[in-house]
Amino acid sequence: MRTYRTLAPWAALFRSGNSVTAIFGVVLGSILASQGLPSGDFAIITVLHCLSVMTFMFSWNALNDYMDIEIDRINRPDRPLPSGEISEVAARRGILSTAILSASFLIVAAYISHSGEIGLEGWLPSLAIWMIALVLLFNYESSSKLSFRMKDSGLPGNLAISMSVGLVIIFGAASVSDPLNQRVWSVFIVGFLYNFSRE
């Protein structure tokens, strides 16, 4: 019971359900691109990509709640941060730790690619996609002068969220070195439009 009380607020902060669901997007992208279950180094890299996406989303979701804490004190006082179940200091550590984990899984995937038959060049699109997602995160959440502040700008913010959701399947295809696969891009477009219509 005590363990549940400790973990439940973190699961809520990280939106663990949505974040874990993203794993299926990565797996789907890799299966569509390779026309079957990936094997060998590709299978290992796909798993690492899944973990990278999951922890990236943990970080983004936690950052979103951290940035909205004052609003949530009024509108959603039951959430982990405004309720005090998780302190702001602990939340910052969680955001940083999960971001580092996401990058670490990516680095391990790069090492496996470089050390094996795939080669680093075949894996580099994965890094580009991860960086695009990071740029979207910065421009969505940050209030910096360098940011487009898309979160509060309506349509651009919706585009950023829909793009980040769609990128998951492209990231999966990149895990098997085929990020330009036509089947994957068809699913990406459908997913992007569906999510955009919901936003």
Explain the meaning of each model-derived region.
Residues G166-D178:
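Hydrophobic alpha-helical transmembrane segments in multi-pass integral membrane proteins
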Residues G36-D41, A110-L124, S143-K151, S177-R183:
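Short helix-coil transition/hinge motifs at the ends and kinks of transmembrane helices
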Residues A99-A109, S153-S162, V176-V187:
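Juxtamembrane/interfacial segments around transmembrane helices
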